[in-house]
Amino acid sequence: EDMLYRMFGIDAELLIDHAWGRETTTIADIKAYRPKENSISSSQVLGCDYDFEGGRLIAKEMADLLCLELVEKGLVTDSISLYVGYSRRLQKKSAHGTITMPVTTSSAKKIMGYTQELFEQIVDRNAPIHRVTLAFNRVVDEMYQQYDLFTDPAEIEREHKIQKTMFEIKEKFGKNAILKGMNLEKGATTIERNRQIGGHKSGE
């Protein structure tokens, strides 16, 4: 053993345990493990001031696109943060808040619902909106996906397959190859943003 420690240092302990069939990671260690936390986000400075309804539409579009990013990367989240900046004319303090979902998911249906709920909780209905930033916090591998009592796992799996198919179509034929009804509403920005790369028009 002394020779192994001289040759391999602290790794020698792992080699010795392995040789004797010992598992150095205990059940307690596994239960105590917490995956590394990350986040993904999206931000828009709007071309003109939006009213409450228009701002809510923008937030939902952003949530939908971030959900596709989760699916693409095999990730899930249980926390959403929203920042809304008002028109510069108002000199009004920005609105911001965070909502924690009872599930860990990449479901666009669920996440857009909670994004809308958060938007309605924190945003002044009478103040024109100029900037929206949305972030998904505590983003982890989809192996940590969790359901609540009101979730049908089969339905979530069907939605996940649809989202994955949508992503593949967009990758192959362009981001505007498949759209949702909200993307065609007045004030929606997804189509225009999809035509841009790094904030500049892509020439499509």
Each model region followed by its residue ranges:
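DNA-contacting surface of Y-family translesion DNA polymerases
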Residues: 1-128
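Acidic, metal-coordinating catalytic segment for phosphate/diphosphate chemistry
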Residues: 97, 101-204
